[in-house]
Amino acid sequence: MLLISDLAEHTKNLGADTRASLLFDGTVGMDNPLTGARVTVTGHLAPSEDPALIARYTARHPGSEMYLGFADFHLYEMTVDRAHIVAGFGAIHWIESADLLFDAEGFEDLAAAEADVVEHMNADHADAVGLYATKLLGRPQGDWKMTGVDPEGIDLRCGGETARLDFEKT
């Protein structure tokens, strides 16, 4: 999901061609970034008005609610085609979306209950949510809140800091 203004040049470009790519760079702080991991995800962007996706996005990015109220801001959902992964110098691969993305089929009940699960955990188990962040992820003490849950893990937020706790694979 991307929140984009209609006034932005890239949004105008999307009107002519919906193809897009996003770079995720894991090389911050490395002495030699060429040896670090990064992935470019390619696909197509389309506007989304799905209430569940909007709720998930605004829970993860609380400041975005203000912009969603503006007539010229819209959420776009990317349909991923494939990814170009550089896992370090010379370790380069193309991966198709089916091998990259989690197949959420069979988890519709979790998606439908996500808001209730998050509300319950924050209201009744705030101490546990804080421990997830501090003990399991090594994050600093703070008022950690759960912002999302999906079949692969949970999303946490404390002020401007976010964290992801992945579930163990079985």
Enumerate the predicted regions with their spans.
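Active-site-proximal cofactor/substrate-binding loop regions of enzyme domains
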Residues: M1-S5
